[in-house]
Amino acid sequence: MHSNKLTVHLNEMLMCSSDLSQITCVACAATCSFNDYFFRKFELIFSRIHMNLNFSGILSMDKFLMRGDESEDDATLLVNSISQISADAFFVTQKLHSNNDHFDVIYYKQILPKKLADRLLIYCEKNIKYFTGNLARVFLFNQWHPIPRKQMAMGHPNLHYRFSGNVIPAKPWNAVILALRNLVSEIAKCDFNFVLINRYKDGHDYIGEHRDNEKELDPSSPIASVTVGEKRDFIFKHYRVNHQPASASEKVCIALEHGSMLLISADTNRHWSHSLPKRRHCQNVRINFTFRKMKLQLNEEDKD
């Protein structure tokens, strides 16, 4: 079998076969038929086959990333791939700790495989349209300021989010972000109905210290934050009513990685503020999806 033909044959098998033993037979035939140079090339292909098979021999969600096949729409590929991730899968998690009370935060190091997170980042860079004009500013210290990042929101019908003097309307879900919302909701065991999407172009973009305590938020719901792109520091600080400086023991910092998720309990959100400070050494884009559960109807006392 000519080397080019075998390569094509292996690629076809990679796309359509779930039988690892069949692929192994081709591997054995290759070791007898080709020189060392091609065998090294074959080993690379075969190792990629192994990496993209799960324990049942079925191709993983990343198969479209290896194919380089652009015959299908990127959005459809992303929706299918995100939807294949099981909320019951084994995720590497880290429970963050503090000496202070009311701190319940879980860090999921990677809910999205790297290549899938790469594709999601590229998709967002091409397709997400961020707010401009009045929706891209906040009212602080008695004057309006431009938001030091880009943002937009999606969610269920008739939802909006008020903060810092502005009212952010929720645009309808698109298929990709809805698929991500469904996955995050299953992992967090919370029916999120709103997402705020923030784009930080580099380490000069940031979000200041704050708590998510707006009246529209369901006070019993956690908040889930998914990151794609540049790794950035995320800092929790114990909230004090008298605004006295927090000691070192009252601060918790974690670097949020590409494809990760941070799950913040409602109790933590009440007693701790959080921020994403400037980091001038960070040169690349980070996009963050902050999933929330909003009240479908405000109480009378919340409508002012």
Regions found by a protein language model. Give the residues of each.
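Non-heme Fe(II) oxygenase metal-center motifs and adjacent flexible, charged/small-residue loops
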Residues: 6, 14-16, 25-28, 32, ...
